């Protein structure tokens, strides 16, 4: 016998009013207390002067030992965000984490963050981790924004955390390491509003990957990683421009196609500084191909040759690259460089790199100047996943700039000898995957109020402690 269900006996629950201007309400950066000089690393590695500082465009690189892991990074970044902005833990309904620093094949970093909310009586928090190289934080951000804009939204805000420890085996990749984390408060009526169009490109590549679960070090195809990044920015930018044109047509709007002329401040994922210069120059090249007769390209040399260049050849043509880096230099120095503070000081932060760029921009440009401006964001993760999207600064960023206090904090990092970095990596190698141990790194290297790993027991359960605040 079946019993009919009378729908009228259920109470219909209406969704809350649709939110407007969903985006980033607040942002916080975390980075280790120590860094090394890339100039000193050149001498330490006995390589030619300028190989890292000019060739890679790097200045410093953050480092940490076995007292820190992705969970301590995430805990410190998130807790600092909550405390600086007096966020009620019960006002958070979702947490999304992006990272590629995997220390457990099952248990997410997000679960470690839940202790903070459980103490406040809030365990109703959606979201888990997203993983794909450096792209996970952007997937996390899109997930959080989409949740707030969906019918599932319960009226609360979200938090997005992204962070990584970027380290490499001895060799050419090691100078492109770094470390850091970002935490962002996501909600409606935000000063930094995510605009609705995303241009995305995804593919299956083996430019950078981590198949060795007994090691933190990646497998890297250096040349392929460069062409993969460049082809990804081409494809995601093209997808964005196509969607933008379609949206304009549907709205009955005319005018020229979208280009960098519509962007006030471009921000890029930064594996290393020179790659950002190449990426920006590549967007300028794409705009040139789309509108070669624009007055701003009148002085481009060998115009006919670049217009006739086969696409595949363009990916590795050093003359083309150098030409458009020259064309783009003034714009790079005046706009893109303002988003490079974290990258210059901390190096590659993987999932936090793009948002470290955003934080750097907000720290570098006065709130009155940046208000009303558009920021483009290029997210990239090897393997590969990439997106081009935009943020409109609709509100006042004064509070964000003041509470970030980014410039002073970056300058207060301890610059340590290169041998200290090598020793830190040796310590991490020695204790990677270890159980029943107490980390050997000094807690003097932890910022006041930062979390650190106290111990791992015989069942590989990690215990974290927070350092006293200053």
UniProtKB/Swiss-Prot annotation:
Pathway: Metabolic intermediate biosynthesis; (R)-mevalonate biosynthesis; (R)-mevalonate from acetyl-CoA: step 2/3
InterPro entries hit by this protein: HMG_CoA_synt_C_dom, HMG_CoA_synth_N, HMG_CoA_synthase_euk, Thiolase-like
An MF annotation (GO) of this entry: hydroxymethylglutaryl-CoA synthase activity
Top-level EC class as recorded in UniProt: transferase
EC numbers for this chain: 2.3.3.10
Keywords: Lipid biosynthesis, Lipid metabolism, Steroid biosynthesis, Steroid metabolism, Sterol biosynthesis, Sterol metabolism, Transferase
Residues at the catalytic site: 100 (proton donor/acceptor), 134 (acyl-thioester intermediate), 269 (proton donor/acceptor)
Reactions catalysed: acetoacetyl-CoA + acetyl-CoA + H2O = (3S)-3-hydroxy-3-methylglutaryl-CoA + CoA + H(+)
Residues given in the record as (3S)-3-hydroxy-3-methylglutaryl-CoA binding sites: 134, 176, 225, 269, 278, 348, 382
GO terms classed as biological process: acetyl-CoA metabolic process; ergosterol biosynthetic process; farnesyl diphosphate biosynthetic process, mevalonate pathway
Coiled coil: none
Pfam family, one: HMG_CoA_synt_N
Highest taxon, organism lineage: Eukaryota
Function: Hydroxymethylglutaryl-CoA synthase; part of the first module of ergosterol biosynthesis pathway that includes the early steps of the pathway, conserved across all eukaryotes, and which results in the formation of mevalonate from acetyl-coenzyme A (acetyl-CoA). This module also plays a key role in the biosynthesis of triterpenes such as ganoderic acids (GA), a group of highly oxygenated lanostane-type triterpenoids which are well recognized as a main group of unique bioactive compounds in the medicinal mushroom Ganoderma lucidum.
Family statement: Belongs to the thiolase-like superfamily. HMG-CoA synthase family.
Full protein name: Hydroxymethylglutaryl-CoA synthase
Gene name of this polypeptide: HMGS
């Amino acid at each position: 016998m079946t019993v009919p269900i009378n729908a009228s006996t259920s109470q219909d629950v209406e969704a809350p009013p649709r939110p407007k201007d969903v985006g980033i309400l607040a942002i916080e950066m975390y980075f280790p207390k120590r860094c090394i000089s890339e100039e000193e690393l050149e001498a330490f590695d006995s390589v030619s002067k300028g190989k890292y500082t000019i060739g890679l465009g790097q200045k410093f690189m953050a480092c940490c030992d076995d007292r820190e892991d992705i969970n301590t990074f995430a805990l410190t970044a998130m807790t600092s965000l909550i405390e600086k902005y007096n966020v009620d833990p019960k006002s958070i309904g979702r947490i999304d984490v992006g990272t590629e620093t995997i220390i457990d094949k099952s248990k997410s970093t997000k679960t470690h963050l839940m202790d903070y909310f459980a103490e406040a009586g809030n365990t109703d928090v959606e979201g888990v981790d997203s993983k794909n190289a450096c792209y996970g934080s952007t997937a996390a951000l899109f997930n959080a924004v989409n949740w707030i804009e969906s019918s599932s939204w319960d009226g609360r805000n979200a938090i997005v955390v992204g962070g990584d420890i970027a380290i490499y085996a001895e060799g050419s990749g090691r100078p492109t390491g770094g470390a850091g984390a970002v935490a962002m408060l996501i909600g409606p009526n935000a000063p930094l509003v995510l605009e609705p169009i995303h241009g995305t490109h995804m593919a299956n590549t083996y430019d950078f990957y981590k198949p060795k679960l007994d090691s933190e070090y990646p497998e890297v195809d250096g040349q392929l990683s460069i062409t993969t990044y460049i082809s990804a920015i081409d494809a995601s930018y093209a997808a964005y421009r196509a969607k933008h044109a379609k949206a304009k047509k549907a709205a009955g709007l005319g005018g020229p196609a979208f280009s960098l002329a519509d962007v006030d401040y471009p921000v890029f994922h930064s594996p290393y500084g020179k790659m950002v210069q190449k990426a920006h120059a590549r967007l300028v090249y794409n705009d040139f191909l789309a509108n070669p007769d624009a007055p701003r390209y009148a002085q481009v040399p060998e115009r006919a040759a670049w217009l006739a260049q086969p696409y595949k050849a363009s990916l590795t043509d050093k003359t083309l690259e150098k030409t458009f880096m020259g064309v783009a230099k003034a714009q790079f120095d005046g706009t893109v460089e303002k988003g490079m503070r974290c990258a210059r000081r901390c190096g590659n932060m993987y999932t936090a790199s793009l948002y470290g760029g955003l934080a750097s921009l907000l720290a570098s440009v006065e709130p009155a100047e940046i208000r009303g401006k558009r920021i483009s964001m290029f997210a990239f993760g090897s393997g590969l996943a990439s997106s081009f999207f935009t943020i409109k600064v609709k509100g006042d960023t004064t509070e964000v700039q003041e509470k970030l206090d980014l410039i002073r904090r970056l300058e207060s990092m301890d610059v340590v000898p290169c041998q200290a970095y090598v020793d830190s990596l040796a310590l991490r190698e020695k204790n990677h995957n270890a159980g029943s141990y107490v980390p050997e790194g000094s807690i003097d290297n932890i910022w006041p109020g930062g979390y650190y790993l106290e111990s791992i027991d015989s069942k590989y359960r990690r215990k974290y402690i927070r350092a006293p605040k200053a």
